[in-house]
Regions:
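Conserved H-D interstitial segment of serine endopeptidase catalytic domains
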Residues: 1-27, 95-97
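Short edge-strand/loop segments of extracellular domains
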Residues: 1-7, 54-59, 89-94, 150
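Well-ordered beta-strand positions in beta-sheet-rich domains
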Residues: 11-18, 51, 84-89, 161
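Envelope-exposed proteins and targeting segments
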Residues: 12-15, 30-35, 62, 86
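Active-site substrate-binding loop(s) of clan PA
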Residues: 20-26, 42-80
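Conserved beta strand-loop-helix elements of the APE1-like EEP
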Residues: 35-41
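Extracellular trypsin-like serine protease catalytic domains
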Residues: 62-192
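Cleavable C-terminal sorting propeptides in eukaryotic secreted/cell-surface proteins
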Residues: 189-222
């Protein structure tokens, strides 16, 4: 964590102490496709590692991004080191509109596709975050966790994300059970903030890469 490239010498690795799988996740069905990673040691926050808000309720967002690791030619000495963190502007689609395109759409899911005219291609890293901005409060929220999609991000083929807001009660219950309870922020009742030391990481169960990335604004291709 704390890097944009696997070849970065500042790469920080964290040991996962426990993986908490949602009890309703039953493959091949992808409803409740979510897990929590509890880390063995605390994260020391700095300008490139910061906590993110979690929405308590679903709402419509008009400025969102999806992050993923992408292979970049000409960087790194080995293919594994050529992975760079990219972000892509995406547009949230209403549940009703998405249900017309996706059969048996769960209420626990939300949909988004690539914003028209946006450069880049959504590869669909399972577990990648969908992050949206609230400009009134100047806060970022992790609204979704990528689950599945076929050439997701293209118009007509939305990417499917687990809706974080739908799982807040479960997150509260599990973090409380582990003695690392997620707490309601005193500043606002519209978002949740983690405790002072340990922070749960939300991840789709199909994810192959642990993605911990924050956004400081739409200022670059990363």
């Amino acid at each position: 964590m704390g890097i944009k490239s696997f070849s970065d010498i500042n790469l920080e690795r964290k040991q996962v102490q426990k993986i908490i799988t949602h009890k309703d996740y039953k493959p091949p069905h992808l409803d409740s496709d979510l897990c929590l990673l509890l880390l063995a040691t605390p994260i020391e926050f700095n300008k490139v590692k910061m906590p993110i808000c979690l929405p308590q309720r679903e709402s419509s967002w008009d400025r969102c991004w999806m992050a993923e690791w992408a292979y970049v030619h000409g960087h790194g000495s080995a293919k594994g080191l050529n992975m760079h963190l990219k972000k892509l502007r995406v547009v949230q689609i209403s549940w009703r509109t998405c249900a017309k395109r996706v059969t048996q759409l769960s209420r626990n899911m939300l949909c988004a596709w690539k914003e028209a005219g946006t450069n880049g291609k959504c590869q669909g890293d399972s577990g990648a975050p969908m992050v949206c901005a609230n400009w009134e409060t100047r806060r970022l929220f992790q609204v979704g966790v990528f689950s599945w999609g076929v050439t997701s991000g293209s118009r007509g083929r939305p990417g499917m994300f687990v809706s974080v807001a739908q799982f807040i009660p479960w997150i509260l219950e599990e973090t409380q059970r582990e003695g690392r309870a997620l707490t309601l922020s005193k500043a606002s009742e519209s978002f949740l903030a983690c405790g002072p030391h340990y922070h749960p990481i939300l991840l789709s169960l199909g994810s192959q890469i642990l993605l911990a990335a924050m956004f400081a604004g739409d200022k670059s291709n990363y």
